[in-house]
From Swiss-Prot:
Keyword 4Fe-4S: no
Protein name per the record: Uncharacterized protein AN7484
Gene3D superfamilies membership: 2.60.120.200
Conditions for induction: Up-regulated when grown with elevated levels of potassium chloride.
Organism: Emericella nidulans (strain FGSC A4 / ATCC 38163 / CBS 112.46 / NRRL 194 / M139) (Aspergillus nidulans)
Keywords: Stress response
Length: 200
């Protein structure tokens, strides 16, 4: 598996395959990953990722936190499917600040994006999430709390996509608001696992 690359990221990307146990991703204001009819398409948020063949993906996990303060502040894990024809589909899961507090948030974008929310456990500002390719080829998203693994979302279509050039697996941060300066998201213990058993 190749090393890390980035999109929309100003910081230097590690040249080898190893990230520090803890690292940050900084999102400037007016950055987002979103798609809503009739014509909203935004994909300018910083992403740190590894590029893999989609059919090799097994799972990804990360712990993360931030001082979420502006509406729609967000960060977490992301999977991007880059199509051979230039189209792009994606799934992102993390924490998003909305309705005056942080929520566990998952958005899946096929033609357009949907969005689901759950409370953050204990009303906190951090979480550990894992995305897994299950034996039935669904993508499942889990909240990890110690030894407890709680399912929070199933996305059925990801591994049924046929016209995929490559997949980006990694982390992202976004601050759609124009206020508040940069959003800094703290990440720890990122794991990216593929079928050849190569990990981070």
């Amino acid at each position: 598996m190749a090393g890390f690359a980035s999109a929309n990221l100003l910081e230097r990307v590690p040249e080898d395959e190893v990230l520090p146990a803890e690292f940050t991703v900084k999102a400037p204001p007016e950055t987002d990953i979103w798609a809503k009819p009739p014509s909203t398409e935004r994909f300018n948020a910083p992403i740190l990722y590894k590029s893999i063949p989609l059919d090799t993906f097994k799972r990804a996990r990360v712990a993360f936190s931030a001082n979420w303060s502006q509406k729609y502040d967000q960060g977490g894990l992301i999977i991007v499917l880059n199509g051979n024809s230039g189209d792009r589909k994606w799934v992102k899961t993390g924490i998003e600040f909305t309705h005056d507090k942080p929520h566990l948030s998952t958005v899946a974008k096929d033609r357009w994006a949907d969005w689901s929310l759950l409370p953050v456990p204990s009303g906190g500002t951090g979480a550990t999430l894992e995305v897994v390719r299950e034996p039935d080829d669904s993508l499942w998203i889990y909240l990890i709390q110690g030894v407890q693994k709680s399912p929070i979302r199933e996305v059925t279509w990801v591994f049924a996509e046929e016209d995929v050039r490559d997949a980006w697996i990694g982390v992202y941060a976004a601050r759609p608001s124009s206020a508040g300066g940069d959003l800094v998201v703290n990440f720890a213990s990122l794991i990216i696992e593929v079928t050849d058993s190569t990990t981070k």
